[in-house]
Structures are given as C-alpha cells and as structure tokens.
Amino acid sequence: MRSFLSKLPQRPWPTSIDQMRNLQISCSQFREDLLLTHLLGYKKTNAFYVDVGCFKPIQFSNTFIFYQRGWSGIAIDANPAFEPLWKKVRPRDKFINSGVSTEAGKLEYLQFHNYPASNQLRIPGEQSQFHLELPPDRVTLIDTKPLSTILKAMVPANKKIDFMSIDCEGLDEVVLKSNDFALHRPSVLLIEDHARSFSSPVHQFCEQNGYRLHSLCALTKIFVDGAIWDVICCEKQLE
C-alpha cells in the first residue's frame, strides 16, 4: 500500500469532465487490452476468451476489461494460489489449475515468491527465454497436459474463441504447439515473444498456421487469423 501511495503523485489524473470522458482504463501490462478493444470493438458482450498463464484476475490481465463487458472464458495457470482469487473476482470464468506442455505428465514448477509473474515450468529440451539471476524459492512437481486436451474438455462444442492470450515466460511456443488449431482456432492471438524478431520460432509458428501479425505491443505480438483478416482489420475500421 505504501508503494502504491508513493506512486500516486506521478500518475496523470483527469482534471476536467472532457478528460474524464476520454479516459481509457487498461489492466494489461503493456496496454494490450486497448489494442484488442480497437480490433474487436465495444459492442460484443457475450464473447469468449482463453487466457493461458493468466496470473491474477485483474493485475496484468489482458482479459479483465472484457470480463467487465460481459465476456467469459477459460483461465489457465499452474499456480494454485490464484484459483480462489479468480473464483471470487471472476466467477463467470473457469479457472484451470494446470501446467501446459506438449504431452501429459508431471514437470517441475519453479516459483519465485517476490516475482510470481515469473513462475515457470522446467521443460526438458526447452529453454525459457526468461532468465532470473536468483534461484527459485520453491520447486514442486505438478501435473501438465496439452492445451488441446484442456480446451477439448472445457470449451463448449462449436464455441468460437474470440481471442487467446498466452504468457508463459518464454515457453509460449510450447503452448502453441500443444493446441489443435483445427479444432480450437482463436480469431486473435496475443502471445509474449521475448525474441521480438519476425524470424523467431513463435512468430514463424503463427505465420505457418495462417496468422498474420497485426501489431507489436512491447513484448506482446498480436496476430489475427488470416482467413478473417479483412473482417477484423478492415471492416472494423468503418464502424
């Protein structure tokens, strides 16, 4: 609380009614939710998202403002401490406490008490792009499964996924590869890519699966399904 209060004087506050009207609230770490709103519009109130590596229900959330507009979806995180928070703050969402990997099994889960947003799986043969100088405070063995398995069990039949947010601390390509895009194909993909390069494995995977890069928001790349690019990126601009 003391840290929060000390930062208040540094934040810009609206000083008039006009400024209040133009105020835009964002909960995302890099304001991805504002870009998403630009893409998907304000009018949808009953749409669906998937949030992989969801963290807390409000802080750094790419999905919270959509929840406030009436959306709902599936939130997946390996940290069991987040489950009661999600059930209390976002009861319409289904929280799944699980790690995500290409094959079902058990993997080591690294936890950093002072940096919970940096918790990550240790996957054999995969190198996280996110490195911490400090060793993990706790290492536990947790159940993991492919994203395709989770979505097949939790997404209603014929339910369209309007967007999917993936933030798994450098292991995002693993999450992508574990999904069945023929069965569950989000219209928009938000994915953290520390490499940033257009030739990164994450970028290449998305393009090879028919997605086109729409925008880069700090570490997050926003891809749109190429099959509906004109509908989302062109017709939306005319609304």
Residue map of PLM features:
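Phosphate/nucleotide-binding beta-alpha loop and adjacent structural elements of enzyme active sites
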Residues: 1-239
